[in-house]
Amino acid sequence: MHLSVLIPGLLRSYTAGVDRVDVEVEPGAGGGPPSLGDGLAALNLAFPGLRFRIIDEQSRIRPHIKLFLDGAQARDLHAPLPPAATLMIVGALSGG
């Protein structure tokens, strides 16, 4: 399954400056539809280290990151990916 991923500026150092990447996602466990987590794993295969900037050690989306799958906020890594989905990664900025 095809997944387009929009990369925010704060993560582009992991994608050689590319702002949009396309990855192919394999079917999920047991041959079911691939999940959002599977999509992030495919993204990490293409760009090692990127998943860790999005997902923490407990396999949770980091608090400063929001994921939007076809325009709707995605909070569950087990959520199935729709066909030809677009994932937008949004990172919060802070400072003073």
Each model region followed by its residue ranges:
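Ubiquitin-like/PB1-type beta-grasp interaction modules and other compact soluble beta-rich domains
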Residues: 1-95
